[in-house]
C-alpha cells in the first residue's frame, strides 16, 4: 500500500511531538526509572494519539490499523524503549478488547478517559508462576451478588505503579474442565478518588536490565470487589 496524505500528516505531527515533548526528557526519565505517565498521556490524548484506531463515539479517530502502524513507526523515534512500550500498552494492549466488546457503560468509564489521556491503564495477564503460560494463571474472580471478588497477583506489569485501572485476565469459572475457556477480561480500578483501591497493593517496582523509564510492578489483589 502507499501512504496517503492523511498518513503523512499523522506521521509528521507524531514525529514533531516526539521531538518536542519526549526526546528532550528521555535521559532524565531513564535515570529516574520512571516517566510522568499522566502528564505525557494527557498531552498525547490532546493530540488524538491515544485513540487513532478507536471508535469516534468514545473520542477516537475511528481510523484503520494502517494509521496505527504509522503512529507506532513515529513513536519508534523515541530515544528509549520504555516510553513507547508504555504508550503501546495503553493503545494496543489494555484497550482494544474493551473497545470491541465492552458495554457502552464500561467504555464510557474506562475507554473514553484512556483515549483522552485522563486515565493511565495497564494489562494484567502474567503472574509469578505463569509468565508465557497464560492458561496457568491462578488469579480468580468469584461472583458474589452483583460483584466479582478478585484474589491473586500479577507480575511484570508495565505502567503498574501509575495506572488507574487494569485490563485483567482472571479465572471466572474455577471448576471448568478446560483451562483455556474459563477466563474473562475484567476492568479493575486500581485507584479510587486518587488513592489506592481497597485490596490493591503495589508490592514492588521491579528493577530491570533495560526499559528503565517504564515502571514495571508486581501487584497483589486481596478480596477486590468489581461490579460484574
Model region roles, listed by residue range:
Residues 48, 71-76, 169-170, 188-195, ...:
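Short Ser/Thr-interspersed hydrophobic loop/turn segments at strand-loop and sheet-helix junctions
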Residues 130-131, 155-160, 211:
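Glycine-rich phosphate/pyrophosphate-binding beta-alpha loops
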Residues 46-118, 159-165:
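Internal helix-loop-helix
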Residues 117-125, 169:
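A short, Trp-centered hydrophobic/proline-enriched beta-strand micro-motif
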Residues 139-142:
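A structural signal for short hydrophobic beta-strand segments in well-ordered beta-sheet cores
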Residues 151-201:
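A short core secondary-structure module
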Residues 62-74, 133-137, 220, 224-226:
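Structural signature of FAD isoalloxazine-binding scaffolds in flavoprotein oxidoreductases
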Residues 136, 193-225:
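Flexible, small-/acidic-enriched active-site or ligand-binding loops
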